[in-house]
Design a protein with these regions (language model features):
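Extended hydrophobic
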Residues: 2-186, 193, 197-201
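Leucine-enriched alpha-helical scaffold segments used for protein-protein interaction
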Residues: 37-45, 135-293
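Accessible peptide chain termini
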Residues: 1-2, 293
Length: 293
């Protein structure tokens, strides 16, 4: 083992700055300056509050609020965070690449990575695993990314690196990106059955309960969300109420068609006929039932 004690002992007058997470009360104070719609969306995601305790991500929230106004759903904020992280990386990355072409490629690649990590039920991968994923991609741009492999964890802005192990900065960013990749599949319900259901026990792997809600706030994927939700309730007839309600935390009935609202109402009605659970007065579930009725 090489000792660096002698090297450090020769250094004098060193100055460093340590950036710590913000305390919860400080984060709340800053979030309170945002619009009511933004605050409501942040409240829906317990993991998002923890992410915003990191100063860099809190700055992204404020930049988004300043540039675009309120966020209509958490997906808009996650998309802004991902875009900003990639932009910052490309700005500081000093290798000669066509940066304007790389952003879209990097986004698609990290969505694929997140999807594969969810299938594997992992929140961390090795550099070898990452290289294998990238190497299997097709096209000239993918080969360019292989040649600039370190871009994906440069300064830990896109993927966070710790001793050669890589992960996303926050588990919900991984879940959001995985949901985007899932949403691109031709038959989402069939794909989800293949990757998320334990066939012998007819049991859905728990990590997908955090991925699936991100399908619900996109108008393009809301129909698939309702079908996926029906699939889950069919397999998990004794689903705990907390998990059941968590799946619905991002649902916006205004993005649903009449038949989708009717199907969702039927699922809600049947669930609360079976489960002796209290529905909070003027809470999100009661509002959802009213709007779907």
């Amino acid at each position: 083992v090489v000792s660096y004690a002698s090297i450090f002992s020769s250094c004098t007058k060193l100055v460093f700055v340590e950036v710590n997470r913000l305390e919860d009360r400080e984060v709340i104070k800053i979030i309170d300056t945002c619009s009511d719609v933004t605050k409501e969306n942040i409240t829906k995601s317990p993991k998002l509050r923890k992410l915003l305790s990191i100063p860099r991500y809190l700055m992204y929230l404020l930049e988004n609020e300043e540039q675009r106004g309120s966020i209509s759903n958490v997906g808009e904020l996650f998309e802004f965070i991902v875009d900003s992280s990639i932009d910052e990386t490309l700005k500081k990355y000093d290798k000669p690449i066509r940066k304007e072409n790389f952003k879209a490629l990097v986004k698609r690649v990290i969505e694929r990575i997140a999807f594969i990590m969810e299938i594997s039920r992992k929140d961390k991968i090795s550099k070898d695993d990452l290289y294998t994923i990238i190497d299997e991609l097709k096209g000239n741009m993918a080969h360019m990314l292989v040649a600039n492999f370190d871009l994906l964890f440069f300064e830990s802005r896109i993927l966070k690196e710790t001793n050669g192990i890589l992960q996303f900065g926050n588990s919900e960013i991984q879940e959001y990106l995985a949901a985007k990749e899932l949403g691109r599949q031709d038959n989402i319900e069939s794909v989800l059955y293949d990757v998320a259901v334990q066939k012998e026990l007819k049991h859905i792997y728990p990590n997908w309960y955090d991925v699936i809600p991100h399908l619900s706030y996109s108008k393009d994927r809301s129909d698939s969300f309702v079908n996926v939700f029906k699939l889950i309730t069919a397999y998990e007839s004794h689903l705990e109420n907390e998990t059941f309600e968590s799946l619905l935390r991002y649902v916006n009935p205004s993005t649903l068609g009449a038949q989708q609202r009717a199907d969702l109402f039927s699922n809600l009605f049947e669930h609360y006929q079976r489960v002796p659970a209290y529905i909070k007065w003027r809470g999100p579930i009661e509002n959802l039932i009213q709007e779907c009725y």
